[in-house]
Amino acid sequence: MFSRLYLEITTCCNRACSFCPGTARPAAFVTPETFRTLAAKLRPYGQYLYLHVMGEPLLHPQLPELLEICRALDFRVTLTTNGTLLPARQPVLLAAPALRKVSVSLHSFEANEAGDFRAYLTGCTDFARAAMAAGVLTDFRLWNLDGAQTKGLHDRNDEILAHLHAAFSEPWQRNTWGWRLAKGVFVSFGERFDWPDAQAADRGALGRCRALSDQLAVLSDGTVVPCCLDHEGTLALETSSARTCRRSSPPLWPARSAKASRKASVPPPLCRRCWATPNASADPKPPPIAS
C-alpha cells in the first residue's frame, strides 16, 4: 500500500507561477470515464488520492463527478490549489464526502501581478472557515522561505500572516511544519524548491527518495510514473490508458520494472537532479510569528 497516490486530472492552470515548471504535455482534462477506470485501478494500492501532478484541479469542469467517483471508491481526497477559484468552487468541494483536505499554495500569488491580493486572501480564509464546519482540513502553504538558491522570494509573507492572524485570532499552536491556526486549519512553511530537470546539475546518487516507497503517480494521459515530481513522464513505468486498464490480468504497472527502478544501484539521471537530496537545504524553521 502507498500512503499517497497521485492522479492528475488536468494539465491546465489559470496562473503562471515562477516556481512551477509547467509542462510540455498537451492541455488535457481527464474525462469521468477515464478517471473512473484509472482510479479503480489505483484503489488496491492505497486510499489517499491527490488529484494533481500539474495543473489546477479546480479548473476541471466535471470536478463534482470526479469527486463522486472518489466517494464510490472510498478514496480520501486531497486537492492542492492556488486558491483563486475557491470561492466559486466552495459549494462543490464542501458537498463532496470524499474530500479530506485542501492545500492552498498562498505563495502562488506573489508570482502573479494580476488580481486583488486582499480579496484573494479573504476568499481563501473564508473557505477555510466554511471547511472547518464541514470537517474538511485546510493547509495554507508558504513554501517560499529563503534557501541556498532562493533569497528574497517572500515579500508578501508578512501581509499574508497578518491576514491569517486576523481571520484566526485564537492562539496558534506550533507543530512540526508550521502552526495550527484553528481546528482543522494549518499553515506550513518550506523553502522554494526547483523541480527535477534532466538538464540541471547532478546532485549525487543519495537522497530521501519516496518514489515507489510511499507514492506513485498517474499522469492525465494514463502514464504511470514513480513519483509526483516526474511531471513530464520521464521515468514512465507504463502507459495505463483507459483501454489498457480495462484488461483484467495485468497489474497497474510492470512489477519487475517498478522493483528495478526502486532498487537500482545507479539512480536515473532525473532522480540525481531532484531537490530531495542531501544537497537540498534542511527543512526550514518557520519565521517568527507574533502571538
PLM regions: where:
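Secreted/processed peptides and extracellular or luminal domains of membrane proteins
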Residues: 19, 23-26, 215, 233-234, ...
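Short cysteine clusters
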Residues: 13, 17-20, 209, 227-228, ...
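Flexible mid-to-C-terminal extensions adjoining Fe-S/redox cofactors in radical SAM and related proteins
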Residues: 1, 224, 229-291
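Processing junctions and N-termini across compartments
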Residues: 7, 11-14, 203, 265-268
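Radical SAM enzyme [4Fe-4S]-AdoMet core and its adjacent flexible, acidic
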Residues: 30, 73, 96-250
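Residues that line or immediately flank small-molecule/substrate-binding pockets and catalytic motifs
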Residues: 24, 53, 106, 252, ...
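Conserved alpha-helical substructure of the radical SAM core
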Residues: 1-102, 112-118, 122
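Short, flexible loop/turn elements at secondary-structure junctions
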Residues: 55, 81-83, 108, 144, ...
